[in-house]
């Protein structure tokens, strides 16, 4: 089994792959785009070609990256940020947040505490379509919003 931790961010993600013995196998940073996802999947496949034998810890339960990982067959475990903070305190009690360390902490968390975490299940086609439709108005509104706020005047 291979364990992957992803420190999620809006522009890029820090990633750490850990073996069953807790040894770091690979660290990297991927872009938050389809090429970044392909890069991550290629890195994982070098160490474990069977997606079902890969557990991924990440601090979000949605988004392009999560959907792609679930669809590819990886076991994706969303970890609450507060829980991730506690896992971080276990590994390094003093110190601030570091993306590389956080990626390793998430990988180690799914390695040691996976039994207490809940993996995401793939969405049905209907659920995916509903989620897409629900996001569409927000996406559309953001795309057409003025660059500066418009002041309303009583008149």
Positions of PLM-derived features:
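Phosphate- and other anionic-substrate recognition elements at nucleic-acid/protein interfaces
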Residues: 1-155
């Amino acid at each position: 089994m291979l364990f992957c931790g992803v420190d999620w961010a809006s522009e890029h993600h820090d990633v750490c792959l850990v073996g069953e013995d807790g040894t770091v196998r690979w660290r990297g940073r991927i872009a938050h785009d389809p090429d970044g996802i392909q890069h991550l999947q290629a890195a994982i496949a070098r160490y474990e070609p069977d997606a079902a034998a890969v557990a991924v810890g990440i601090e979000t339960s949605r988004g392009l990256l999560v959907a792609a990982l679930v669809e590819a067959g990886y076991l994706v475990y969303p970890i609450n940020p507060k829980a991730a903070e506690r896992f971080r305190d276990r590994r390094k009690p003093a110190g601030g947040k570091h993306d590389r360390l956080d990626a390793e902490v998430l990988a180690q968390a799914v390695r040691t505490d996976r039994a207490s975490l809940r993996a995401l299940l793939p969405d049905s086609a209907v659920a995916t379509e509903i989620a897409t439709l629900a996001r569409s108005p927000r996406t559309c509104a953001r795309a057409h919003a003025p660059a500066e706020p418009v002041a309303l005047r009583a008149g």
